[in-house]
Regions:
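Pair of pore-lining "gating" transmembrane helices in MFS-fold secondary transporters
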Residues: 5-30, 104, 203-219, 301-305
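Conserved MFS/SLC helix-loop-helix module at the cytosolic interface between two early adjacent transmembrane helices
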Residues: 58-97
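Helix-to-loop junctions at the C-terminal end of transmembrane segments
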Residues: 59-71, 155, 256-268, 352
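Cytoplasmic helix-loop-helix junction between adjacent transmembrane helices
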Residues: 103-138
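Helix-loop-helix hairpin linking two adjacent transmembrane segments in secondary transporters
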Residues: 135-183
Length: 387
């Protein structure tokens, strides 16, 4: 049995949020290198990249029930090593279909970790009576940003497989250490208290929250999958360091999330959501009209800032609807978010094949406008105090 380590629960969960996406960020920076190595065009790459969200979508169908049945701690202890190992297999992909299969496995493992982390963060927020969900996701963004910059630096130094092996090997011990002594906020009767989730009986507020998240996640998915390709298309096929565009996007996502909690307290959830969605729309306009790298980088920064608080606000709102159904509700929210993540990149890729990447990015405008319209559905949830 693993012995406990005494951690501050807030710092602990933020640390786990940071370490979880580091290797993922390395992979995202290496997408152009993998595309060149496998000789894939934009539509083929779009198809291959569908593996991750497809795996997440399939797993999230039963992830909420697994969280209640096995508990958050077991999912984290088992999920981290399998997740890191699955990402390293990307370096062994020999073609489109093997890449699709490996990324599907990454998605399966990633969905369980994502759900476990968000549910645990929500419970820490409730038990400590501290507003911290945005900061947790801020640390997640810092982690993926650090991985992206690391991947850009190492891109020309070795093979994709070796780079991923090194980064995963360094991240795993830190993840395991942070998970030791994780406080148990499990509800011992959660399996009995959480009735089956029936789509037709979902509360209207949850539906509104989910589709607010749809446009945000579609934009995040597009940036994760196409930011490096966008920069490479702008600078030329021999350009190095193309992951810096996504790194800048992730940096501003982190920046926005660190200030998101205080802004939420001062301005309220709905006003913050509207302001930030408008910022992301402005950033997308910059990307579509950019003729030089500096305007494009400004666009990446604004989009990162604009989408930064969307998902954390939605997670807090969804988790606070019903204590007995927090895991299924967060799982359903993640499902809708990942549908957005799934829909955006392939549409952009297929359109970019016949036109260019800028034209493909215009497909993000309807989703962001939907998020702007539905921002009124978010309620200003605050952590519930113990009686």
């Amino acid at each position: 049995m693993i012995k406990s380590i005494s951690w501050n629960p807030i710092f602990q969960v933020m640390g786990i949020f940071f370490i979880q996406p580091v290797v993922l960020g390395v992979w995202l920076a290496l997408i152009p290198k993998v595309q060149s190595g496998l000789n894939l065009d934009t539509s083929q790459l779009a198809l291959g990249l569908m593996g991750t969200p497809a795996g997440m979508l399939m797993t999230l169908h039963f992830a909420g029930k697994m969280a209640n049945t096995f508990g958050i701690r077991k999912i984290l202890y088992i999920g981290f090593p399998v997740y890191f190992f699955s990402i390293t297999l990307i370096g062994q992909a020999g073609g489109l279909y093997s890449l699709l299969l490996v990324l599907f496995l990454v998605g399966v493992c990633g969905s369980l970790l994502t759900l476990a982390l968000n549910v645990h963060a929500g419970r820490v927020e409730i038990h400590t009576r501290r507003v911290m969900m945005n900061r947790c996701h801020g640390f997640w963004s810092l982690g993926i940003m650090a991985g992206s910059f690391l991947g850009s630096v190492l891109e020309s130094e070795s093979t994709v497989w070796l780079i991923l092996i090194i980064c995963a090997s360094a991240s795993f011990p830190l993840a395991l250490l942070l998970c030791l002594g994780l406080p148990s906020y499990e509800n011992v009767n959660s399996a009995e208290m959480s009735p089956a989730l029936v789509i037709t009986q979902l509360p209207a507020i949850l539906i509104g929250i989910c589709f607010f998240t749809f446009g945000i996640s579609m934009t995040e998915g597009a940036m994760a999958n196409w930011a490096s390709v966008y920069v490479k298309e702008m600078l030329g096929p021999e350009a190095q360091g193309t992951g810096y565009g996504f790194g800048l996007f992730a940096a501003f996502v982190a920046f926005g999330r660190f200030f998101g909690d205080s802004l939420k307290i001062k301005l309220g959830t709905i006003k913050v959501a509207r302001i930030f969605v408008n910022i992301s729309i402005l950033g997308l306009i910059f990307l579509v009209i950019a003729n030089d790298l500096w305007l494009a980088l400004a666009g990446f920064a604004l989009i990162g800032l604009g989408v930064s608080v969307g998902f954390p606000l939605a997670v807090t709102a969804a988790a606070s609807i019903d204590d007995k159904r927090e895991a299924p509700y967060v799982a359903f929210l993640s499902l809708i978010a990942l549908i957005g993540f799934l829909v955006g990149p392939p549409i952009i890729g297929f359109l970019a094949k016949t036109t260019n990447i800028k034209t493909g990015l215009t497909m993000l405008f309807p989703g962001l406008l939907l998020s702007l319209y539905l921002s009124s559905k978010l309620r200003s949830s605050k952590p519930k105090k113990k009686k």
